[in-house]
Amino acid sequence: MKIKSYKQNFISQRKDKKSSDFYYIFAYSAHGYLYRIFEVFNKHKMPVDLISTSEVNVSLTFESKYNSEELINELKEIADVELYASRASISLIGKEINQEPNIAGRAFSVLGEKGINVEMISAGSSRINISFVVKQELADLCVRELHKVFFEDG
C-alpha cells in the first residue's frame, strides 16, 4: 500500500537524540506536573523535540549535544527518571497522513517483522506527521524498510 499523494510525503530521520521517561504515580492528579518538568528544561535552555504523555508517564526526546547530567538530577526531584542515549526519531510526514487508514499499523508491523522496537510514539493533531523513536543503530534500516513499504511496491 503506497501513501497517497507521493510527491507530498516524506520519511525523515534525526539521529543523536536522547530519550527520557518520567514516572510519577500521582501525576494525573498533580496540578502543574508538566509545567515543573518543562520549567527545568527551560532553565537549562534545552529544547524538547518529541513528547508523549499518559496519566503517570511523560516521555520526550532532546538532542544529545546538550549536557544532561545536571538537568536529569533536577528532574529526579520531580519524578523517577530513566535516560536512554543513542536514539533516533523517525517521522512519516505528509498532508493528513495520520488520517489515512492503517499507515501507522502498516509501519509498525513492518518494523516489528524486522525486529525493530518502537520505543515512543508521538502524533500531534496537525495531521502532518507521525513520529517515533528507535535505537540509533536501527534508524537507517528503519527508513529503508519504510521506504520499501510506502514508496516502492514492497
Stretch-by-stretch model annotation:
Residues 1-154:
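A conserved regulatory-domain signal marking ACT and ACT-like small-molecule sensing domains
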